[in-house]
């Protein structure tokens, strides 16, 4: 599963990375394909408690289904941070894709691996897969 900031404009980068990984023949757990799960056009969730619950439960279901979480460190995200913590707590591998410097220790601490570009990511995934 690829996760990153959806609410703060990162959904296109998530989709792009899913495409790259599919082209490299990785099995993808794509949490964005289901209808209604791309909420990038929603600017205020304060009066949408039911939708919030639905989105969070959906995303956590996909965290559970995943073997590896690839986290895009392109911008801060409440949801991504929670997904990282939960993934770590249930024994999933977390890879942080950090193309730019990271000015906080939190995502580094909750990552098993840190890569700086997609080529490093692909090499690491191949190593983790055993190939």
Regions found by a protein language model. Name each.
Residues 1-131:
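Conserved catalytic or regulatory cores that recognize and/or transform ribose-phosphate-containing ligands
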